[in-house]
Swiss-Prot record:
Span list, region Transpeptidase: 378-663
Residues in compartment: Cytoplasmic: 1-30
A single BP term in Gene Ontology: regulation of cell shape
Catalytic activity: [GlcNAc-(1->4)-Mur2Ac(oyl-L-Ala-gamma-D-Glu-L-Lys-D-Ala-D-Ala)](n)-di-trans,octa-cis-undecaprenyl diphosphate + beta-D-GlcNAc-(1->4)-Mur2Ac(oyl-L-Ala-gamma-D-Glu-L-Lys-D-Ala-D-Ala)-di-trans,octa-cis-undecaprenyl diphosphate = [GlcNAc-(1->4)-Mur2Ac(oyl-L-Ala-gamma-D-Glu-L-Lys-D-Ala-D-Ala)](n+1)-di-trans,octa-cis-undecaprenyl diphosphate + di-trans,octa-cis-undecaprenyl diphosphate + H(+); Preferential cleavage: (Ac)2-L-Lys-D-Ala-|-D-Ala. Also transpeptidation of peptidyl-alanyl moieties that are N-acyl substituents of D-alanine
Region (Transglycosylase): 72-244
Name of the gene: pbpA
Acyltransferase listed as a keyword: no
PANTHER family: BINDING PROTEIN TRANSPEPTIDASE, PUTATIVE-RELATED, PENICILLIN-BINDING PROTEIN 1B
Protein name, as recorded: Penicillin-binding protein 1A
């Protein structure tokens, strides 16, 4: 035992020796130095990180933050006040003196009790929240408290986003400290109360007072102030109008009592006020008088699309997020100068509202729904296509609630035959496939054409017959579907869609066939809408008066920020070349025929030239007219939101309305024409073959078949007409009764006709030269295939099995009605 004690003592002495103590001391010394260095390094790294975040913070624009108290304003094209910006986000700016003292104290008490003491951030609250959150984590609670002051919340609402990150929090704290250096406490609190989210679409205490109590904010009592003060922490949870809280109001009632308790604790209200308020809640609860009515602007149809366009342009130019641009538009003090002509806008609305304009529609056109809104609706757009500025845009007929669906701008529908100038004849002429005088056969599709177009069975014309050889001009005037399908097939679906998309039409995945490009039949799936609207069509038809150039349509001319700086400007229009100047002019000239002598005569007004095209969708469910003058382009739509048949024709209803509104737009304007470009010529053509005429084309028993029409230089036909042929027949001897079979040696001799020498100044069009020259509907026994001859011109068949002869001149067969009519898609459009 003694030996063991001695060994233990020796080890203890060795351990406590100065040498060993020195090692321990050194270890502890270096350990603490290491900890210190690690701490210094960590602090340095964190400091550098924080400093880098601060440096990346957005510049504090105090005026911009205060401008959240300024409503954005819209002006008309003369600079006169139109509307205050009202978005779906309801926000009504009020001054500090309009806000009750109890409401200010309620927010301060429950949100930031040391608001009047701190300099932007509450250090005491930060450490208190950290300790509370750590304690909660240790106890298994997932509840996390926040430490943001009112100043920080204002910075988040006005400058930053709702992103949850340390970076955003550091920026928020830094900017809050900076803001306190520039604004008084009352200025900060007032701006905060005008911008704080209050649930749903309500922002600011004034909007909330209207929603919950139908009161001006200045008229709120103590309990109502306490309720709104408690609402902002969790607007959905404490929403007294929600169904859940109506059944069990204890959540928002207890929250209101908590606000009152805090106000009393801080000395903002007396004990008597506190007790009276609590007794009122216990006895009567909180009496809500909800007001969910959305505010309506003075020029609802024009204002909201203009705001939409400005938002999109701001996001594109300045890379704003949706949240940022919504804040800026709602209350950023912007001045938006629109292109709206106030008088024209009002007058177009009156025309669309007038029940007398819909008398041709026989199935109760003035019927209203349960909200007092006409079931039969209409929309219209008028554009100065040179500048792209929209002068009038009306999205509905009759009085309608705020935020009603704008059919002129937001809606997309099938456009029927209004597509034909845009995606059929315009592209065909532009691509050099023909001119106004090129001929296409209005006849049933051949088997080859059925296959190439995708039709299983024969499509039909609206007029339910076939007209035989038609010029492009006549085909578009009478809106031949068969002719359009054949020409569109030559153009190619992909080419047609490319033109249509550049013109603003939208093609969904199921609307990429020839029935869409030739006839305007869009699928228009509710989940994937496509087609066009009057805004789109008015812009598109403007190209025919603007040398083939589409000027981007704009509803505003410029936007100024709250400091008066121009932040958006449309004085230099965005332009896209669609057609050549020559092709666009030829289409314009063709489109005048439907107004001058076709189904759209009522679209004509005064002495101003008018060109346009009707459109009808399947089953007479939509009627359209789109057109232009040398000054403006416009489009009209009439139909039901829930489509149903209208039992008349597009030209009967839409063209008179077009004439009326465009007459108003052209008041006091002088006659002028669209300027004819160089590079086009009027060329003599045979209206039966579409080829160069010979002298025989003038000898047709129906009258001369030669006429003159526009072609782009170099695209006119080069082949001579082979329809009209001069035959010499050896007639039998009528005195010989026995020679009925004896003249086998008699031969028909064909002589080559002379080329016709046309007068190149002749301006006759087919309908002007001989109104009786239109082919009849006599069935033909010949091949109805369409051939492409001479520079891509679509021409009718050339090899016939049966010829009608008269005076030795062979005339072409007429279109037949004897084809299979069991078509895959026999919907009729015009």
């Amino acid at each position: 035992m003694t030996e063991r004690k001695r060994e233990h003592k020796d080890r203890k002495q060795k351990k406590n020796s100065p040498k060993n103590q020195s090692k321990v001391t050194k270890f502890l010394k270096w350990f603490f130095i290491g900890i210190l260095l690690l701490g210094i390094t960590a602090v340095t790294v964190v400091g550098i990180y924080v400093l880098s975040i601060i440096r990346s913070s957005p510049e504090l624009d105090v005026q911009a933050i205060q401008s959240l108290n300024q409503p954005s304003i819209l002006y008309d094209d003369q600079g006169n006040f139109m509307d205050n910006v009202i978005t779906r986000e309801q926000r009504y700016v009020v001054k500090s003196e309009e806000i009750p003292d109890n409401l200010k104290k309620a927010f301060v008490a429950i949100e930031d009790e040391r608001f009047y003491e701190h300099k932007g951030i509450d250090i005491k609250r930060i450490f208190g929240v950290i300790a509370s959150n750590i304690k909660g984590k240790l106890s298994g609670s997932n509840t996390v408290q926040g430490a943001s002051t009112i100043t920080q919340q204002l910075i988040k609402n006005a400058v930053l986003t709702n992103e949850v990150s340390y970076e955003r929090k550091i920026k928020e704290m830094y900017l809050a400290l900076e803001l306190e250096k520039h604004l008084s406490k009352d200025e900060i609190l007032t701006t905060y109360l005008n911008t704080i989210p209050m649930g749903g679409y309500q922002y600011g205490v004034s909007a909330a007072a209207q929603r919950f109590f139908s009161k001006n904010v200045s008229d709120l009592n103590l309990v109502e102030c306490a309720y709104l003060g408690g609402l902002t922490q969790a607007p959905t949870s404490y929403d007294g109008l929600s169904e859940a809280n109506k059944e069990n109001p204890s959540r928002y009632l207890n929250r209101t009592k908590s606000v009152l308790f805090k106000m009393h604790e801080l000395g903002y209200i007396s004990s008597e006020q506190y007790n009276d308020a609590i007794n009122e809640i216990d006895t009567n609860g909180i009496k809500f008088t909800p007001n969910n009515k959305l505010s309506k602007t003075n020029f609802e149809w024009f204002t909201r699309p203009a705001i939409t366009q400005v938002k999109q342009d701001l996001m594109n130019k300045y890379k704003y997020t949706q949240e940022e641009v919504d804040k800026l538009i709602a209350n950023g003090g912007l001045k938006i100068y629109t292109s709206m002509d106030r008088n024209l806008q009002n007058n177009v609305q009156k025309v669309l509202d007038d029940p007398n304009n819909y008398k041709a529609i026989t199935n109760n056109p003035n019927e209203k729904n349960e909200d007092g809104v006409y079931k039969l609706q209409a929309s219209a757009t008028i554009i100065d296509y040179k500048t792209g500025h929209v002068k009038a845009l009306v999205g509905g007929r009759g009085e309608q609630p705020a935020m009603s669906h704008n059919r002129a701008y937001y809606d997309l529908k099938s456009i029927g035959s209004a597509t034909k100038p845009l995606t059929v004849y315009g592209p065909a002429i532009d691509l050099g496939l023909g001119g106004a005088g090129s001929v296409v056969n209005d006849s049933p599709l051949s088997n080859k054409e059925l296959s190439s177009t995708g039709y299983k069975d024969q499509p039909k014309n609206e007029y339910n017959s076939y007209r035989g050889p038609l010029t492009f001009r006549e085909a578009i005037k009478i809106s031949s579907n068969l002719a359009a399908i054949k020409v569109a097939n030559e153009v190619g679906v992909s080419n047609s869609i490319a033109y249509g998309e550049k013109l603003g039409l939208v093609y969904g995945p199921h609307s990429r066939g020839i029935s869409t490009t030739a006839l305007g039949q869009f699928q228009n799936d509710p989940n994937n809408p496509d087609g066009g609207n009057t805004y789109t069509l008015a812009s598109a038809f403007g190209v025919f008066g603007n040398n083939g150039v589409k000027t981007n349509a704009k509803l505003y001319t410029k936007v100024l920020d709250s400091h008066g700086n121009v932040i958006l400007d449309t004085s230099t229009p965005e332009e896209t070349k669609i057609f050549s100047p020559q092709a666009s002019y030829i289409v314009y000239d063709m489109l005048k025929d439907q107004v001058e002598s076709g189904s759209a005569k009522p679209a004509k007004f005064g002495n101003i030239p008018v060109a346009g095209k009707t459109g009808t969708t399947t089953g007479d469910k939509d009627y359209l007219f789109a057109g232009l003058t040398p000054y403006y382009s416009a489009a009209i739509w009439i139909g039901y939101d829930k489509p149903r048949e209208m039992r008349t024709s597009s030209g009967t209803v839409t063209s008179p309305i077009f004439g009326k509104i465009m007459g108003l737009a052209h008041k006091d304007l002088q006659y002028k024409e669209v300027e004819q470009p160089s590079g086009i010529s009027k060329i003599a053509v045979c209206m039966d073959s579409g080829l160069k005429p010979t002298s025989l084309c003038t000898q047709d028993p129906r009258g001369s078949r030669v006429y003159y029409d526009w072609f782009i230089n170099g695209s006119a036909p080069t082949q001579y007409c082979n329809y009209h042929t001069n035959l010499h027949v050896n007639a039998p001897d009528t005195n010989d009764n026995n020679n009925s079979g004896a003249n086998e040696g008699n031969k028909q001799q064909e002589t080559k006709p002379e080329e016709v020498k046309p007068n190149e100044n002749n301006n006759n069009k087919p309908n002007e030269q001989n109104p009786n020259n239109k082919p009849d509907n006599t069935p033909a026994n010949g091949n109805n295939n369409t051939n492409n001859n001479g520079g891509g011109n679509v021409t009718p068949p050339q090899n016939q099995t049966e010829n009608n002869t008269n005076n030795g001149v062979i005339t072409p067969p007429q279109a037949g009605n004897n084809q299979n009519q069991n078509g895959q898609n026999n919907n009729i459009t015009q």
